[in-house]
């Protein structure tokens, strides 16, 4: 134990089942699918699960066999592929959560560079979990593009068709608040950092949250 944190090196699936957790962050190399069942079972009655997926070829539709095998879904490589990738991952999480009587509520979701990153709130509720598929559907590629409960024509999915963000949380993620929380104190910066290094660090923080608060209502609709 160091600074109140217990560090353990071992099999993640085994470790996650040894105690209930209120917060789990899955960030494996490649697909997180093999860890989801253990992680979701390990979340307390109410808890946060964060998941990163770097197998974007499967999620974005260019590796269709892998997508079908891992996610039970299919994508299309077009202007919607990044949104599809995010929603396909959320759909799988929602399905596995429902298997364990838990409902999923997205907090934040993004596609950045070569990975998908989602944060979700999980709550134990048989009633809500029973209706998990109300937000599962397909993106139909016919004008106007739209979500539908059943596939037809050219489509991607199945995927999560509900909100991607929690508007209340995302609406508070302003650049000013991010700098306040994440920039740290000057005394904590490495001694060899110049003024340029500090400014670069702050710009990266700004970039990570830019437009989120302004888009909160749209993305939570």
Where are these regions (language model features)?
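SAM-dependent transferase fold signal centered on methyltransferase-like domains
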Residues: 1-221
């Amino acid at each position: 134990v160091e600074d109140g944190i217990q560090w353990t090196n071992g099999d993640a699936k085994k470790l996650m089942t040894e105690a209930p957790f209120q917060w789990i962050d899955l960030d494996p190399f490649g697909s997180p699918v093999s860890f989801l069942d253990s992680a979701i079972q390990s979340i307390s009655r109410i808890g946060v699960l964060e998941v990163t997926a770097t197998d974007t070829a499967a999620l974005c539709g260019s590796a269709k066999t892998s997508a079908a095998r891992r996610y039970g879904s299919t994508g299309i490589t077009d202007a919607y592929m990044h949104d599809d990738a995010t929603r396909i991952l959320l759909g799988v999480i929602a399905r596995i959560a429902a298997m364990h009587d838990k409902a999923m509520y997205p907090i934040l979701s993004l596609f950045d560079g070569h990975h998908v990153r989602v944060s979700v709130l999980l709550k134990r509720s048989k009633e809500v979990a029973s209706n998990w598929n109300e937000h599962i559907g397909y993106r139909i590629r016919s004008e106007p593009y739209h979500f539908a409960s059943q596939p037809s024509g050219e489509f991607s999915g199945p995927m999560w068709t509900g909100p991607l963000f929690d508007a209340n949380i995302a609406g508070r993620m302003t650049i000013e608040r991010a700098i306040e929380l994440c920039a740290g104190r000057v005394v904590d910066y490495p001694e060899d950092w110049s003024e340029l290094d500090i400014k670069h660090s702050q710009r990266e923080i700004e970039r990570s949250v830019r437009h989120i608060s302004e888009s909160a209502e749209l993305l939570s609709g």
